[in-house]
């Protein structure tokens, strides 16, 4: 999944290539996305390239090629000029969900003796990505696996937590909550936009989101930029 800004940049590049055959400049991309500096564009392009959406052509200035578009925006692309992507909402973000329908939570299934846990989408164990706001399906789990409280599940994408035994394709079970102890693995919401699965640490007054893979750097944020959305209590792996 892509963040809102990644979606916007990908579509902006695609539309510019379609109209002129020439990729936009970094200044044009910065202005289009209303970013303060070009370093933000560099990070977005790197993330899009890592996910296989674009490719930078070597030895050519401003050479970008769009390899694919997300399934959510590919249909009817020519009929719309601006895409309004889904971002984290409700208890996984800053925008409250529609009042007519409460957010799904784990519920008891009296007929089978299991607990139904909603799968809410995907979570990055790598570069942060937006979590899907809608329930995709549910898992039936034994009550002793998760204990009391409200829970949801997320599918892991990325390899930054492999040393903690969490691999790409695993499903993590998260207990909802807005606090965590140092060393616990949490779903962290960064800047009310991006969700990531990382180990929670405190560095003085700041919050550190620590990977369990030496290839990834620990990211440090001010306390007002990070909100805990729940902590890891279980993991499911299919073979």
From Swiss-Prot:
Residues 90-110 are annotated as: Disordered. Residues 26-46 bind DNA. InterPro entries: LexA, LexA-like, LexA/Signal_pep-like_sf, LexA_DNA-bd_dom, LexA_repressor, Peptidase_S24_LexA, Peptidase_S24_S26A/B/C, WH-like_DNA-bd_sf. It comes from the Bacteria. GO terms for biological process: DNA repair; DNA replication; negative regulation of DNA-templated transcription; proteolysis; SOS response. The keyword Transcription regulation applies. The record marks 125-126 as: Cleavage. Its EC number is 3.4.21.88. Keywords: Autocatalytic cleavage, DNA damage, DNA repair, DNA replication, DNA-binding, Hydrolase, Repressor, SOS response, Transcription, Transcription regulation. GO terms for molecular function: DNA binding; serine-type endopeptidase activity. The keyword Heme does not apply. It catalyses: Hydrolysis of Ala-|-Gly bond in repressor LexA. CDD domains: S24_LexA-like (cd06529). The active site is at residues 160, 198. Belongs to the peptidase S24 family. Homodimer. Represses a number of genes involved in the response to DNA damage (SOS response), including recA and lexA. In the presence of single-stranded DNA, RecA interacts with LexA causing an autocatalytic cleavage which disrupts the DNA-binding part of LexA, leading to derepression of the SOS regulon and eventually DNA repair. HAMAP family: LexA. This is LexA repressor.
